[in-house]
Amino acid sequence: MVKVGINGFGRIGRLVTRAAFLTKKVEIVAINDPFIDLDYMVYMFQYDSTHGKYKGEVKAEGGKLVIDGHAITVYSERDPANIKWGDAGATYVVESTGVFTTIEKASAHIKGGAKRVIISAPSADAPMFVMGVNHEKYDNSLTVVSNASCTTNCLAPLAKVINDNFVIVEGLMSTVHAITATQKTVDGPSGKLWRDGRGASQNIIPASTGAAKAVGKVIPELNGKLTGMAFRVPTPNVSVVDLTVRLEKPAKYDEIKKVVKAAADGPMKGILGYTEHQVVSTDFNGDCRSSIFDAGAGIALNDHFVKLVTWYDNEFGYSNRVCDLMAHMASKE
């Protein structure tokens, strides 16, 4: 099992750790965060307002974070080049600070003994992989990769199924997205993105997202055919993608449902889901899948123009994919 270090113990860092202990696909051996001391790490990992209390045992012992009897080395370095990943036995590093998102910046982890770096965010230059969509294109020559964004992980599997079966001519995506840590609790300054600075719990906030364009990087035949935007809404977790597309091949809505269900039950099982239940956002809190197609929520104007709806736990689904990507990479060593 691949040994992993986590840089940045924020929402994604903690939930990747949680996912790793629940799925046992990778082993967490080290965590670095200059802003959180060991006792605070114990507290933050144990108690979670969104996903509930961690059900196992968490404690500090001998200067290490101990989860379910498993000791994890803790560092508090600001410069990634100074983190001694090698000493802790970590060969892969999850870069989840949100700061070191380019190949050059993320490569600093290699200096401390890491072999590969997985950026848990979109990257301007690192190759992006979405499990179930283009993960087979990964090869051993790559040392720094990106797991793309939570929204790209939701959109890409559905876009792939639709494009493979009916060919997408063009499309627009909106994500109705839960609050994240980058937003403000009350109105405050926010650089050039003035709307983003408005109170998160008080407003529906139109925002930009690169998620749809990023799909063109993971599915090259869709490059230039999709773009999108976001609405930030006052819910703590779980988001939903609305994908409106023009199809080259005519399709009844029932046919679309059929091919999505076949993918969800078959090649994309565990990544793409399918539901005909009368669900709402809370029903997906803690869902491990990347994208759950809501058969009852979509609509068709005609056989060439449809609106498709798919849900995602933007925190936990994504964190599980980070673990899956690392396990896949390790299988290629």
From Swiss-Prot:
Compartments where found: Cytoplasm, Cytosol; Cytoplasm, Cytoskeleton; Nucleus
Cellular component aspect of the GO annotation: cytoplasm; cytosol; microtubule cytoskeleton; nucleus
UniProt KW keywords: Apoptosis, Cytoplasm, Cytoskeleton, Glycolysis, NAD, Nucleus, Oxidoreductase, S-nitrosylation, Transferase
InterPro entries: GlycerAld/Erythrose_P_DH (IPR020831), GlycerAld_3-P_DH_AS (IPR020830), GlycerAld_3-P_DH_cat (IPR020829), GlycerAld_3-P_DH_NAD(P)-bd (IPR020828), Glyceraldehyde-3-P_DH_1 (IPR006424), NAD(P)-bd_dom_sf (IPR036291)
UniProt: D-glyceraldehyde 3-phosphate binding residues: S149, C150, T151, T180, T209, G210, R232
Site description Activates thiol group during catalysis, residues in chain: H177
GO biological process: glucose metabolic process; glycolytic process; microtubule cytoskeleton organization; neuron apoptotic process; peptidyl-cysteine S-trans-nitrosylation; positive regulation of canonical NF-kappaB signal transduction; positive regulation of type I interferon production; protein stabilization
Gene3D superfamilies assigned to the protein according to its UniProt record, in alphabetical order: Dihydrodipicolinate Reductase, domain 2, NAD(P)-binding Rossmann-like Domain
Keyword Cytoplasm in annotation: yes
A Pfam match: Gp_dh_N
Positions of NAD(+) binding: R11, I12, D33, R78, S120, N314
Catalytic residues identified in the record: C150
Family: Belongs to the glyceraldehyde-3-phosphate dehydrogenase family.
Free-text function comment from the UniProt entry: Has both glyceraldehyde-3-phosphate dehydrogenase and nitrosylase activities, thereby playing a role in glycolysis and nuclear functions, respectively. Glyceraldehyde-3-phosphate dehydrogenase is a key enzyme in glycolysis that catalyzes the first step of the pathway by converting D-glyceraldehyde 3-phosphate (G3P) into 3-phospho-D-glyceroyl phosphate. Participates in nuclear events including transcription, RNA transport, DNA replication and apoptosis.
Record text on subunit structure and interactions: Homotetramer.
NCBIfam families tied to this protein: GAPDH-I
Protein name per the record: Glyceraldehyde-3-phosphate dehydrogenase
UniProt source species: Danio rerio (Zebrafish)
